[in-house]
């Protein structure tokens, strides 16, 4: 199997269990390996037939910036689930997260590495009036899911004060209270929207497909 690799992606995010770590961002480094057959893209020159590593980097940055993790183990698990859910051509994901400041003065870094295949994340699909919701992964702190809004249908959910949502459009077209959603994360942006609309309407003849992460507002760990 071919592998697309991203080496030493550097991000600043909230990660850790100690009080200072909950208040201030710290640097983490990631190595990613996406196992997929790249021959269709290699022969056609079409980036849509492979995993665009620039977009992958933005997606990972968006999730880590938004999530406020307690453990890098959970961060690695969620990154793997997200990438496998979003990128249909990817069959396995390797995620290594390094935390340089974890053992300051004692070691160069602490790290965790996970290797996940599709079968490691048995998803559940629920049919809803607007389309479908596929839960990619649910943890104590968050839920990662794909939303499919059928043509000319509208998703509406009541605001939930116990959680916040990050979302972006993967394909199709959709609009929310603040206008149309982007099908790509803006270049250089840490995340697309930390205020995911409660009302979304599919536009055009094709379904709108979105990724969404719900972050639960936990009072204690």
Roles of regions detected by a PLM:
Residues 198-205:
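Asparagine-centered strand-capping/turn motif at beta-strand->loop junctions
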Residues 160-179:
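Glycine- and acidic-residue-biased ligand/ion/polar-headgroup-sensing regions
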Residues 182-184, 206, 217:
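Short, surface-exposed beta-strand-loop junctions and turns on beta-sheet-rich folds
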Residues 207-212:
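C-terminal interaction-tip segments
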Residues 1-137, 142-147, 151, 168-171, ...:
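N-terminal, polar/charged subdomain of small-to-medium soluble alpha/beta proteins
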């Amino acid at each position: 199997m071919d592998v697309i690799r991203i080496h030493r992606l550097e991000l600043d995010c909230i990660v850790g269990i100690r009080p200072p770590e909950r208040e201030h961002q710290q640097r983490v480094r990631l190595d990613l390996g996406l196992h997929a057959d790249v021959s269709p893209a290699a022969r056609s020159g079409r980036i849509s037939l492979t995993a665009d590593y620039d977009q992958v980097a933005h997606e990972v940055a968006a999730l880590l910036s938004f999530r406020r993790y307690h453990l890098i183990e959970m961060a690695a698990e969620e990154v793997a689930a997200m990438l496998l859910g979003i990128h249909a051509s990817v069959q396995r994901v390797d995620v290594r997260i390094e935390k340089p400041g974890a053992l300051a003065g004692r070691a160069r870094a602490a790290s965790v590495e996970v290797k996940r295949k599709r079968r490691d994340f048995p998803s559940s699909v629920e049919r809803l009036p607007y389309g479908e919701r596929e839960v990619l992964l649910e943890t104590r702190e968050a839920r990662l899911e794909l939303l499919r809004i059928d043509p000319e249908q509208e998703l509406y959910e009541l605001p939930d004060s116990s959680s916040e949502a990050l979302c972006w459009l993967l394909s199709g077209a959709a609009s929310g209270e603040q206008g149309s959603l982007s099908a790509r994360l803006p270049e250089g942006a840490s995340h697309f929207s930390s205020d995911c609309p409660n009302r979304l309407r599919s536009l055009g003849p094709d379904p709108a497909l979105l990724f969404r992460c719900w972050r639960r507002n936990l009072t204690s760990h």
